[in-house]
Amino acid sequence: MAKEIKFSEEARRAMLRGVDKLADAVKVTLGPKGRNVVLEKKFGSPLITNDGVTIAKEIELEDPFENMGAKLVAEVASKTNDVAGDGTTTATVLAQAMIREGLKNVTAGANPMGIRKGIEKAVAVAVEELKAISKPIQGKESIAQVAAISAADEEVGQLIAEAMERVGNDGVITLEESKGFTTELDVVEGMQFDRGYASPYMITDTEKMEAVLENPYILITDKKISNIQDILPILEQVVQQGKPLLIIAEDVEGEALATLVVNKLRGTFTAVAVKAPGFGDRRKAMLEDIAILTGGEVISEELGRELKSTTIASLGRASKVVVTKENTTIVEGAGDSERIKARINQIRAQLEETTSEFDRGKLQERLAKLAGGVAVIKVGAATETELKERKLRIEDALNSTRAAVEEGIVAGGGTALMNVYNKVAAIEAEGDEATGVKIVLRAIEEPVRQIAQNAGLEGSVIVERLKSEKPGIGFNAATGEWVNMIEAGIVDPTKVTRSALQNAASVAAMFLTTEAVVADKPEENKGGNSGMPDMGGMM
């Protein structure tokens, strides 16, 4: 495949056209009066969204050089989304402003390396100042404000705040599509895993089709149980106590399963068998989690423990266990709180070390199950199109809220960036480095300017007034009033604002120091014979 190469000014100009096309499509969504963008889908209804990263990922341009520029900015949105989960539109707006301003100066003869140094210096100062003015998030109300601003919906803000209150800041909050029109919250207390009963004959509540065990003993093993003789000694001990038994094993089958079912039907005693969750090493870890939560032990030959010699002291306890066809929920395990805390810290340490997104998700899930529970937000809407859009907004709001809990909040609506303006302007720099600082100064005005423009106002007027206002005072584009942003509940997570600025600066610096661009040369369509081979072009 032949390649086409463009150099210096020509290369940067071609890429800038791509940057502008993508950024112009994304930035119309910024602020409380931002518009939506409609994305064509090959199958199903089109997607209507105001989520920056979703729009950026969809854009592919025909010209390969323009496309490279667009992809660079899409990378800013994507990276910000990965780190902070929101702020992707702000990051795109900042990147476009830095690239455009930087390119003007490079064209006028400035040294890109000097500009890069200036940009990096200015961003470092801005980030330090953002951290200094950041306020920790306190109480349910603050959480609701952050979520409501991100989702542009107060009801969603309240739902997310309630979910975080119920399952804690480390709890898992998942999104599901609801069958109805309303969006509601469902909280699963205790530990739940996706394995149901081994036989429907084990159910105790025929109406709900579930087995409910009150104050049961819990046998946890990684072995397959097919011979009833293996578990007979422990069954006899449990029967003497007059309590039900939950068996979590690799599998329960054959004679063992039949005996448990027959005794349940006769009313002799109640035992419910479920398969162990997970696979391989993850299964071992999850069984250990369950054992610690319930105060039991994992009966495993690897640990030198045999089923036949198991006593009642090795079994776990819980106040209640509910087993459905698909899930098992253990409520109020009787484990030692110190051991549970130590296990949680161990999982946190693993979380910090892992680089795999999949592993991270699984570890967070385990952490939440030990820490207190899982909240499910069931998203409802009138149409499929509205449902997709609403789900994306709630996802952003959820990420935004987590980021706020982590690093605190700053004034929203682009005000925080304007509040660091004077600190950045005071940086002492010379020559091209000073130009780099000025580029960042111009860029941090851009989010406010764009929010105002999307609200149908003159952005420059708002920006100039903001420079002379006291820190924290900003423009509420939703109402057209000047207010104390934090008191009015218009806030952004510090992590989101910081990540947007850092990622935009990183890509802008790379862009400005680009001197050559290599792309595949488009193949020319030779035309002529369009028939099948050996058919002489006739069809």
From Swiss-Prot:
Functional description taken from the UniProt entry: Together with its co-chaperonin GroES, plays an essential role in assisting protein folding. The GroEL-GroES system forms a nano-cage that allows encapsulation of the non-native substrate proteins and provides a physical environment optimized to promote and accelerate protein folding.
Name this polypeptide is given: Chaperonin GroEL
Protein family according to the UniProt entry: Belongs to the chaperonin (HSP60) family.
Chief site of localization: cytoplasm
Keyword Transferase: no
Keyword field contains Nucleotide-binding: yes
InterPro entries (alphabetical): Chaperonin_Cpn60_CS, Cpn60/GroEL, Cpn60/GroEL/TCP-1, GroEL-like_apical_dom_sf, GROEL-like_equatorial_sf, TCP-1-like_intermed_sf
EC number: 5.6.1.7
Keywords: ATP-binding, Chaperone, Cytoplasm, Isomerase, Nucleotide-binding
Gene3D superfamilies: GroEL, GroEL-like equatorial domain, TCP-1-like chaperonin intermediate domain
Lineage: Bacteria, Bacillati, Bacillota, Bacilli, Bacillales
GO cellular component: cytoplasm
Catalyzed reactions per annotation: ATP + H2O + a folded polypeptide = ADP + phosphate + an unfolded polypeptide
Cystines in this chain: none
